[in-house]
Amino acid sequence: INIFGMENEFLQVIINILNNSKDEFERKEFEKKYIFIDTKITQDEIIISIKDNAGGIEKEVINRVFEPYFTTKFKSKGTGIGLYMSKEIIEKHMKGNISVKNENYLYKENSYDGANFLIIFPNKQKIKVN
């Protein structure tokens, strides 16, 4: 997938999401730690999914993760602006959409729970999908 424009900012969004997964892995003990990055192109959209198996985001806070200065981490670990800035970059500057949901999925016949961040851009080139 080629996404043109704002490469550094887009990379920062990916890093912010990966850092949150890493921080959650450090808070809990996991035998196996997974982060999956999947991409899909449809006639209308370019979809990027980033999911982990760090247990997901608590129901009480999942709707707040993109708010400025919201954090569940100790002050020395997070400022609460990483995901807020990620949303600003994706939605205001790159004209896409970013969301998060908790998801249960299978991998190698094992069940895992984690957060799944979806980044969706319009497919302006209308690439044909077979």
Residue map of PLM features:
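Acidic ATP/Mg2+-coordinating residue in the GHKL
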Residues: 52
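Short conserved segment of the HATPase_c
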Residues: 57-69
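A residue-level detector for a conserved hydrophobic packing site
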Residues: 10-14
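Glycine-rich ATP-binding loops of the HATPase_c
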Residues: 94-108
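Short beta-strand/loop element within the Bergerat-fold HATPase_c
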Residues: 32-44
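Conserved micro-motifs of the catalytic ATP-binding
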Residues: 2-5, 72
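Detector for a conserved hydrophobic position within an alpha-helical segment of the HATPase_c
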Residues: 90-91
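Short alpha-helical Gxxx[C/S/T] motif in the catalytic ATP-binding
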Residues: 82, 86-87
